[in-house]
Structures are given as C-alpha cells and as structure tokens.
C-alpha cells in the first residue's frame, strides 16, 4: 500500500469523524425543512482541498452523521452536499492556483471568492431540489404548504442556504 493512500484514508477518516460528531454536539437552528448546524460544512470544505475521492468520502460520512440525528429530509439535504463537494474538489484539483495571490497562498482574493460564490449557488440549488421533491410528493408538515412553495423552497432553502456557505 502506498504511503499517500494511507494518508488520504486517515485524513478522510478524521474528517468523517468530525462530520459525524458535529450534528450531534453543535448548536442547531431548526426551521424544518431547514436545519442550520454550526460548523457542519467545515469537514467537507477541508476535504475539497485534498482530492475528489476524499470529498466524496467525507460527504457520505457526514450524511451518515445527519441520518443519526435529524429527520430524513435534513439528512438528504446533507447527501446533496456530494454534488458541490465533488465539483469543488475537482475544480480545486485542476486549478490549484485559485487560492494563490501573487504566488502566495491566501483565501483573500477575488478568484477564490468567486469560486466560493459558485459553490454556494450549486449548494443551494441541490438543497432546493431535495426540498422541492419532498414538497411535491406531500411529505412535509402542513404549515409549509400554507406558507407556500416560494417561501419554503426559495427563501428558506435558497437564499438562506446560499448564505450558509
């Protein structure tokens, strides 16, 4: 076995461990179908800087953590993170210079902020799709139908979801 694969496996395991623990112990704001868990995206964002494989493993592992502690709709929203994690990790692997400014590593540059915005839009769209499916099959509390599709999906999941990244 190569040293590099053991390293990636270890990093994945540590990040998955963080991803499973975070929904259990961190504070949450729950406005179903929305649940905003403090630091829930951190392991996934760290994983994106390694490889797409690590990002996928961590996305699946954190989804498991949410399945243990939250309703199915929220856990499936966590599974939707697989989409933006895979796209983001692939892009970072192909364009590692996005985090460089004048040859120095920095997060404070416009190219990286643009990348974050695009990832945020993908994140929101994927979560909106999950909530839309639950909305249209009638598997949500009645109060969300009385608030309407626009509020439940676009405001609660779209705009608020965009700001969580």
Regions found by a protein language model. Name each.
Residues 1-165:
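Loop-helix junctions at membrane interfaces
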